[in-house]
């Protein structure tokens, strides 16, 4: 073994923790592996071909917040040994008052994981929206200050839907604009963005939040009728209406570097799409579905110059 090879091996854990081996590591959302433990999840993610894992560090997730000091290092040892990155986790943290927030941040700093997905806010449907945003902003300010103290970045996931703060994107921009995106930022989900603005809205949202984005999530959908109502029908990557190539081209042009989370939130997976803790379809079928979408994702990433 040469000296250069030795140094590469010594650097591997740090690279795995930060995702520094690539600008855009494609990560599996561990919510879809809640039916098994860290060891099997890691082995399957390595087999399927993911660059990393977005661990659920929240109540009911792979890591419980109150046990993070003990459980996170054990999980990372397994994941990093397999050569997979952990550039982020998905957390339960809303603001500094969230139970175990400081404990989680301490563990993330110690582990060298720089980013976490930030749990979101909801509107009270009976109150004016501007007044509620004014009340939320100090909570964002305090979280930004806490993240600066720990050297961390919170990424606000953009969900679609009624009473979701951030669904319209402009409200999220108003909450983030006065703070450094290295402390509080967006985790821009293009599937949800397209559901909220399928013609031009998602394009404006990407232009608006692009400079504030530190993580992106990819999922696809097409409108589905349920009774008299139309709802997003989540589907396999490339089978819906999301323009992934245009989105990725735009987000790259905005200077984005960070984790890409691939979400599988459609019923073909028999419940594990929503975090079910047992399989209802054969494991071989699950692996084939995960591989199929990852391969489709990598094709579009190459077309956008991000692979």
Q: What residues fall within each predicted segment?
A:
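Twin-arginine (Tat) signal peptide motif
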Residues: 1-7
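Hydrophobic faces of well-ordered beta-strands that scaffold small-molecule active sites
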Residues: 24-30, 53-55, 86-91, 116-118, ...
């Amino acid at each position: 073994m040469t000296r250069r090879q030795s140094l590469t091996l010594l650097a591997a854990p740090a690279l795995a923790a930060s995702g520094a081996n690539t600008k855009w590591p494609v990560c599996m959302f561990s919510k879809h592996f809640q039916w098994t433990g860290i060891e099997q999840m890691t082995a399957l993610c390595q087999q399927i071909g993911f660059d990393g894992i977005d661990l659920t560090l929240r109540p009911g997730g792979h890591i419980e917040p109150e046990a993070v000091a003990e459980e996170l290092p054990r999980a990372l040892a397994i994941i990093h040994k397999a050569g997979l990155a952990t550039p982020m986790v998905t957390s339960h943290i809303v603001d500094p008052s969230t139970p175990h927030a400081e404990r989680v941040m301490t563990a993330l700093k110690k582990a060298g994981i720089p980013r976490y997905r930030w749990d979101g806010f909801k509107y009270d449907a009976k109150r004016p929206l501007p007044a509620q945003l004014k009340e939320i902003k100090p909570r964002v300010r305090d979280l930004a200050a806490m993240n600066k103290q720990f050297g961390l970045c919170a990424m606000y996931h953009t969900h679609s839907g009624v009473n979701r703060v951030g669904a319209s994107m402009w409200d999220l921009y108003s909450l983030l604009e006065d703070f450094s995106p290295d402390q509080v930022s967006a985790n821009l989900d293009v599937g949800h963005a397209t559901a909220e603005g399928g013609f031009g809205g998602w394009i404006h949202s990407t232009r608006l939040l692009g400079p504030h984005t530190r993580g992106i999530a990819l999922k696809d959908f097409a409108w589905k009728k349920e009774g008299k109502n139309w709802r997003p029908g989540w589907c396999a990557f490339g089978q819906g209406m999301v323009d992934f190539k245009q989105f990725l081209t735009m987000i790259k042009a905005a200077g984005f570097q960070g984790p890409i989370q691939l979400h599988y939130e459609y019923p073909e997976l028999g419940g594990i799409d929503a975090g079910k803790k047992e399989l209802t379809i054969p494991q071989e079928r699950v692996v084939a579905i995960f591989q199929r979408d990852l391969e489709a994702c990598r094709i579009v990433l190459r077309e956008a110059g991000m692979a």
